[in-house]
Amino acid sequence: MKRVEVAAAVIIREDGFIFAAQRGYGEFKDYWEFPGGKLEEGESAGCALTREIREELDSEIEVGSLIKTVEYDYPAFHLTMHIYASTLVSGSLKLLEHENSMWLDIASIDSVKWLPADEEAIADIKAYLFRL
């Protein structure tokens, strides 16, 4: 089975809300996800995440602590997703690849249809946010 390794950012505002982005393409169109993308060969998860947020959202983030690494089997590939707490350093999270976005608090985090691998991390993300 093909293996894909990605990094994803849980971008957290000062008020504890987190940023979610909605896919506008492909098999999982209209599902929600934490922004990020594939690691290039020899690239660290943190560097990949910084690069992907710059490419997808025209913004700079500070990558913080690892919240969880999800291992998930999609029908066509195995995904390893490293999910990091992050904060916005500059930019306005301009959507360059996604169709929609929203800020969610702990109470509303379950109100969107997450990608299956992202869904696997929701409990850990909630626990992380409760500790802030």
Model-identified regions with their sequence ranges:
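Conserved N-terminal beta-strand and adjoining loop/helix that marks the start
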Residues: 1-18, 38
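Generic C-terminal helix-cap and adjacent flexible tail
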Residues: 1-2, 126-132
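Hydrophobic packing within well-folded, soluble alpha/beta domains
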Residues: 12, 45, 49-54, 66, ...
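Active-site-adjacent beta-strand/loop module that shapes the phosphate/pyrophosphate-binding cleft
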Residues: 13, 60, 70-92, 102
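Conserved Nudix-box catalytic region and its N-terminal flanking loop in Nudix hydrolases
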Residues: 17-55
